[in-house]
Amino acid sequence: MDGVINVLKPKGITSFDVVRDIRKIAKIKKVGHTGTLDPLASGVLPICIGKATKIVDYIMEGTKTYRVEMKLGTTTDTYDREGTVLEEKEINLTPIEVEKTIKKYIGDIDQVPPMYSALKINGQKLYDLARKGIEIEREARKIHIYDICILSIDLPYVIFDVKCSKGTYIRSLCFDIGKDLDSGAVMWNLQRLEASPFNIKEAIKLEDLNEENIKQYITPIDEALKDYEKLSLDKKFEKLVLNGVVLKDRRVLDNIEENKLYRTYIEDDSFIGLGMKNAYGFKIHKLLT
């Protein structure tokens, strides 16, 4: 059983809880998720099974889309509704001011991750330190916000969709927006709508999965990687690439870009893995047969 299941994670459980449930249903130990969703959050959580655990990092590279409900006027230590309230303020803002400030975050930004996160610094998870009352300096990380679509502003609440890169913390985004508005803000609700190429419309609820039907909800490994461009190789190259040989044939190299991963097939139908061209030629980067 190898592939990816697009699970609809409910609120109130951890991402690892979902992994544990899938292990029980599938009766297989090799199961992993493709990016943590906080217990407060719900939505798309792709779960990799069997050989598909080898592509966790590649799926995580994809874009994410979230529906965010943010509450202005409140600041907490966790940057969400579940934390200890540190400050509350009256809001004297107009919807236009709020929208203008939020839209400023579209593009490349430097974001400081929250203390209450699974990120490790010097081998320690930040949330373990935070629970001990220890706060340490965190370096800002480059992230990209592709788009923000504001759905409603009913102060103190704002609902918007955000499409973002890997590594984006929505709680930090809310905190930063609140800081810019001088009002404070917390993430009130969060739903992941997409974890490319998976979307919420096709996600399956945990309670609807069982030992009998789980296979029908498994997406094959190559389909889970469809964000990567397809490359078909002639049958004569099969043994070479499977043995790790670098291809220098111009018929292969002239049609592809350098330093870009390709979803690689033999003769259009036999998927073998992800390959890449570098200065020396083309080679399979991750064998997935």
From Swiss-Prot:
Its EC number is 5.4.99.25. The keyword Isomerase applies. It comes from the Bacteria. It catalyses: uridine(55) in tRNA = pseudouridine(55) in tRNA. The keyword Cell cycle does not apply. Keywords: Isomerase, tRNA processing. InterPro entries: PsdUridine_synth_cat_dom_sf, PsdUridine_synth_N, tRNA_psdUridine_synth_TruB, TruB_C. The active site is at D38 (nucleophile). One of its GO terms (biological process) is mRNA pseudouridine synthesis. PANTHER family: PSEUDOURIDYLATE SYNTHASE TRUB1, TRNA-PSEUDOURIDINE SYNTHASE. Belongs to the pseudouridine synthase TruB family. Type 1 subfamily. Responsible for synthesis of pseudouridine from uracil-55 in the psi GC loop of transfer RNAs. This is tRNA pseudouridine synthase B. It comes from Clostridium botulinum (strain Langeland / NCTC 10281 / Type F). The lineage of its organism: Bacteria, Bacillati, Bacillota, Clostridia, Eubacteriales.
